[in-house]
């Protein structure tokens, strides 16, 4: 029997909304930013930057120039050294 790993929205994808800064936006708008790197074949590295004020995880996508894979990874390492890292939620330490 298939079971979900976590609770998620099964509604029509075109009708889904996500709240950003108190404003409801179409869910698919967020994929635009990831698509910029994917569609142009640019290297990208995604890193966690820690939780927000509500404890939800936040991350950033570092997009580099063509063939700049090691540059995006290097910047991610620098940010991690400055304290931008994954913080396990309570109970998952």
Locations of the language-model features?
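Serine-dependent amide/ester hydrolase catalytic core
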Residues: 1-35, 39, 90-92
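Structural helix-boundary/capping segments
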Residues: 38-93
């Amino acid at each position: 029997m298939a079971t979900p790993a976590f609770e998620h929205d099964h509604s029509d994808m075109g009708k889904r909304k996500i709240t950003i800064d108190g404003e409801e936006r179409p869910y698919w708008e967020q994929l635009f930013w990831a698509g910029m790197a994917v569609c142009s074949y640019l290297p990208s590295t995604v890193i966690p930057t820690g939780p927000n004020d509500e404890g939800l995880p936040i991350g950033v996508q570092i997009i580099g120039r063509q063939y700049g894979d090691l540059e995006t990874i290097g910047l991610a390492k620098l940010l991690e050294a400055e304290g931008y890292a994954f913080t396990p939620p309570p109970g998952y330490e």
